[in-house]
Swiss-Prot record:
Residues 1-26 form the signal peptide. The keyword rRNA-binding does not apply. Induction: Up-regulated upon milbemycins A3 oxim derivative (A3Ox) treatment. Residues 198-226 form a propeptide. GO terms for cellular component: plasma membrane; side of membrane. Putative adhesin which is involved in cell adhesion and virulence. Plays a role in Candida-bacterial interactions and subsequent regulation of filamentation. This is Probable GPI-anchored adhesin-like protein PGA28. One of its GO terms (biological process) is cell adhesion. It is found in: Cell membrane. It comes from Candida albicans (strain SC5314 / ATCC MYA-2876) (Yeast). It is a lipid-anchor; GPI-anchor.
Length: 226
């Protein structure tokens, strides 16, 4: 109940007390006690809602505040039954015996964007980075160069060069080399010449199998001689 009483006292202080005074006449409140409590708050605490200042206010302030709130029925369903109860709550709040908090103590800088990154955003970013890395690796590994052909009345020159080599080894060796050169030029029409050459060389060796076959042939030749 003291928790609800604490908020009831807050409603009677500072700006809320001014609103209470404004509707005092319409609600049949005790106008004089509301006015006196408000004046004490302005003169002693400069209108600020400071628990330390409120705790040290004279007893007359709490009496007027209690009478004002009681006549306006603002202390219903609370355990405030006397002016001393109001003072006690203010003083407990001043000594931090009652839990209080300030919005200013919450810093938005403590929260980072990565904490809220959705799974979709994280997956998309990862896929993008993976595709970029894969594309760079593929281009470097295959050595493929895209070229464009040009032709027409005002074309002057066009050339294309492509070379590559592949080496495969599996119980042997295979090497393939290819070169291609294309050149062309035109002034009023289109002409082109191309020269390509390809050579492939494949060498396979099976040391173990060849040696065994050679021994078998020698044995067969000896048998025929006998």
């Amino acid at each position: 109940m003291k928790f609800f009483a604490y908020f009831a006292v807050i409603a009677l202080s500072s700006a809320s007390l001014i609103n209470l005074f404004k509707r005092a006449t319409a609600n049949g409140c005790e106008v004089e006690s509301c006015y006196k409590a408000h004046q004490t708050l302005i003169n002693s605490c400069n209108g600020a809602f400071d628990f330390n200042c409120l705790c040290n206010l004279p007893q007359s302030y709490f009496q007027n505040l209690y009478d004002c709130s009681k006549s306006c029925d603002t202390l219903q369903e609370s355990d405030i039954h006397s002016p001393s109860d109001i003072r006690s709550i203010y003083c407990e709040a001043a000594s931090n015996s009652i839990y209080t908090f300030s919005i200013d103590s919450i810093s938005l800088d403590m929260i980072g964007y990565s904490d809220f990154e959705t799974d979709t955003e994280a997956t998309t970013g990862s896929d993008t980075r993976t595709k970029a890395a894969t594309g760079a690796t593929t281009s470097a590994g295959t050595g493929v160069t895209k070229t464009s052909e040009t032709g027409g009345v005002s074309s002057t020159a066009n050339s294309e060069a492509k070379s590559g080599s592949v080496t495969t080894s599996k119980s042997g060796s295979t090497s393939i080399s290819e070169s291609k050169t294309t050149s062309g030029s035109s002034s009023s029409g289109k002409s082109s010449s191309s020269t390509s050459s390809a050579s492939s060389q494949q060498t396979s060796s099976h040391a173990g199998g060849a040696s065994g076959a050679f021994v078998s042939l020698l044995g067969l030749f000896a048998a025929l001689l006998i």
